[in-house]
Amino acid sequence: LLPERDSVSESTLRGRMMVKQLGIAYEEFNIAPVLDALGCYRWRDDAIRAVFPDYGVGWKNKIVISGGQTGHFNYFKLVVQSPNGEVFDQRLDSKNYLQIVAATNFKQRVRKTLEYFHADRLNYAVVGTPNRVEYDQGFFVKNGDGSADIKPIAHLYKTQVYALARYLKLPEDICNAQPTTDTYSMAQGQDEFYYALPYDKMDVALLAYNSGASTAALAEALGIGVDQAQFIYSDIEAKRKTTAMLHWPGIPIEPVIGPNNKPPILG
């Protein structure tokens, strides 16, 4: 369990509940000092202050997505909350958006580094967490939460993951928890940051798309207009294209051939 400065306590509590329920040995380590030393929070806050100069101690933040269901290009907004509860939002330019995301991605990558440390010392494999929608739509960090030796739920839609949790008799607090990135200091659902649809509707949309269902069929299933259904399909296609490189392995400049003209691992 690897919380940090912006993690909500409920996530750590649910993690403890799950490992105890399943009888899994675990360690708990706060990675905030590591992130601080790497400059994670400093780089992030510098970019936030470029948009909101007053941002400082006691403020909170998150990034939200807009545009995908209306036919417009997706764009991201920075939302901040002052210590007295006032909320402000502003559309992000590319430079500051990329810096905030790059700094935030330290969190997933530091966690994965620690996972592989323990895997190495115990001679274990690292198990990944992306579900089908996350894997298909590129909602993971390359060499972060997207890195694993085995990905046992990458073929399961989110609703199926919830069903699996109930089959395993995990506590209801876990089974009823809403998906969250738990990455930003303000409460943020995955639909706010990436999908622009609640997870259950996103499951239906991706299943419909993968099954070749018409936009009219998707519109009927979700209770929306055909135009909006087409926007959702277009957004699915766009995310597949723009995140394809997250799935790419490292590419050698020259072919590395082993016996029988096959890559060494297959020779």
Give the residues covered by each predicted segment.
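ATP/NTP-dependent adenylation/nucleotidyl-transfer catalytic domains that generate, transfer
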Residues: 6, 17-34, 38-107, 113-125, ...
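Short, proline-centered helix/strand-breaking motifs
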Residues: 1-5
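Conserved strand-to-helix beginnings and helix N-cap segments that scaffold or border functional pockets
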Residues: 9-13
